[in-house]
């Protein structure tokens, strides 16, 4: 499972979904799905834009969470 840390990163910078959407041009719905970790797929361009905007590494935004079977 891929874990998205967008909500944590946005919280640290005190950014709202509207702020990120407005400043990056990314659709608000896309940001919302990433924020709430309900996105099933996302364009790499979106991930790149978010990382550049938040000045973070890909590994800060996304992580693979190993399942315990």
Mark where each language-model region is:
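DNA major-groove recognition helix of helix-turn-helix/homeodomain DNA-binding modules
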Residues: 45-60
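A short, Lys/Arg-rich alpha-helix, primarily the initiator
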Residues: 1-18, 23
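Recognition helix of helix-turn-helix/homeodomain-like DNA-binding domains
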Residues: 26-41
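Alpha-helical DNA-recognition elements
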Residues: 33, 37, 49, 67
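Short, charged recognition helix plus adjacent turn
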Residues: 62-69
